[in-house]
Amino acid sequence: MLFRICWLIVILVTTLVAELLCCRVGALFAAPFFLCFYLVVTCNWQIGLAGGIIACVVSEVVLSRSFTALPLLALLVPFAHMWRHNGDRRHAYIQALPGALFGLSYATWFVVGENIVLWPLGFRMAVGESVWIVVLSTVCAAIGFPLMIAILDGIASLAKLPVFCQRSVG
């Protein structure tokens, strides 16, 4: 049990570091969504939701965001549960599809939200800048999610824990 808790802490820190690194280049990396999706498919929906909530809250506190993405996270869990039973987990190009979808939704959520919070005209982002952030975030997510799965699977396989790519259907 203690070993699994340590594993969860390691993958939580890994995902948050990935998000911070992508933020340095101007992309909103959907690391809490990726962690939630990974844990729901690999373990179960309770662990996935708890890990996603912790990652989301820590990410928002560290990055000083104005509001939360927890409502979107709640929508992600049924999708991940469906993917657990029906989705293909072994190919990176298939893994890039939910990655791009999560990146697009995460970036759009925060860009629109920040523009609403910064309502006075002088403080909002320009449309071109907003679109650039969403596009860059989607591309980073489509590339980053399969990479993150490979890294987290490597950590899990060293620890003899269940891995995403070898999880049997059902």
Question: What is each of the regions a protein language model found here?
Answer:
Residues M1-G170:
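Terminal, non-globular segments
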